[in-house]
UniProtKB/Swiss-Prot annotation:
UniProtKB keywords: Cytoplasm, DNA-binding, Repressor, Transcription, Transcription regulation
Biological source species: Lactococcus lactis subsp. lactis (strain IL1403) (Streptococcus lactis)
Cellular component terms per the entry's GO annotation: cytoplasm
Gene: codY
Binding region for DNA: 207-226
Family matches, as InterPro entries: CodY, GAF-like_dom_sf, GTP_trans_reg_CodY_C, Transc_reg_CodY_N, WH-like_DNA-bd_sf, WH_DNA-bd_sf
Cellular localization per UniProt: Cytoplasm
Protein's name according to its UniProt entry: Global transcriptional regulator CodY
Length: 262
């Protein structure tokens, strides 16, 4: 059996390994899986909205209803509101308490089940909650030492995620601004008309129809789309006689156009 020191080293190694993949829908799955393995429990990481950032379920304690929460990547609002009101680690919550993550329909199946919740902080802000549970066997003091270390590691990782998201938002905003600024008045008018034809962020348009509708030439539309595509703001694909398929890659385009008067 691994010693406390060995387990501690495994957790601190997570910081060095950079196990997050921000392109994944659950960017902290790998990290959560490693933490659950070291602490020997089921575990999940949620942000302050209750959205799942990662989870690992080596032990089957869920029913279909609770499985759906993990499938939807979102825990119930009532549970999340209670969880974010915890400011220090709450250990070994009995299975019949509101903060226990076990399905209430299955309490009889896990009479010795316990849940431990630990707040995650980073840069002085509450970033989420680390939730762990076992069907049998309380979390010991050694386990809780690992939990405290784990939340520190997660806090650093989440802080990095927020920083990267901020940098990405700034980059997208800058690219959208630069792309719109390259457009002439007629081209901006054309792009606005095209956006109105889309179903949300994508759809297909017929340039000649839009050109006739707003009184411009088809070449103006073609030039506008070429500029936006070269800036990485949209992508397009010819559909032949059906027109052109468009997808907005940078949704900042909507705000930039909305701020212009035509």
């Amino acid at each position: 059996m691994a010693t406390l020191l060995e387990k501690t080293r495994k957790i601190t190694a997570i910081l060095q390994d950079g196990v997050t993949d921000l392109q994944q829908e659950l960017p902290y799955n790998s990290m959560t899986e490693r933490l659950a393995n070291v602490i020997d429990c089921n575990a999940c990481v949620i942000n302050t909205k209750g959205e799942l950032l990662g989870y690992s379920l080596p032990y089957n304690t869920n029913n279909d209803r609770v499985d759906q929460f993990f499938y939807d990547r979102k825990l119930p609002d009532e549970y999340v509101r209670a969880a974010v009101r915890i400011y220090d680690t709450m250990a070994n919550v009995p299975v019949d308490r509101p903060l226990a993550i076990f399905p209430e329909e299955s309490l009889g199946d896990f009479p010795k089940g316990v849940t431990t919740l630990a707040p995650i902080y980073g840069s002085g802000m509450r970033l989420g909650t680390f939730i762990m549970w076992r069907e049998d066997g309380e979390f010991t003091d050694d386990d809780l030492v690992l939990v405290e270390l784990a939340t520190t590691v997660i806090g650093v990782q989440l802080s990095n995620l927020k920083l990267e998201q901020m940098e990405e938002n700034i980059r997208k905003d800058t690219m959208a601004t630069m792309a719109v600024n390259t457009l002439s008045y007629s081209e901006m008018k054309a792009v606005k008309a095209i956006i109105e034809e889309l179903d949300g962020e994508e759809g297909h348009v017929i340039a000649s129809v839009i050109a006739d509708k707003i009184g411009i030439t088809r070449s103006v539309i073609v030039n506008a789309l070429r500029k936006l595509e070269s800036a990485g703001v949209i992508e397009s694909r010819s559909l032949g006689m059906k027109g052109t398929y468009l997808k907005v890659l940078n949704t900042g385009l909507f705000d930039k156009l909305a701020g212009r008067n035509f």
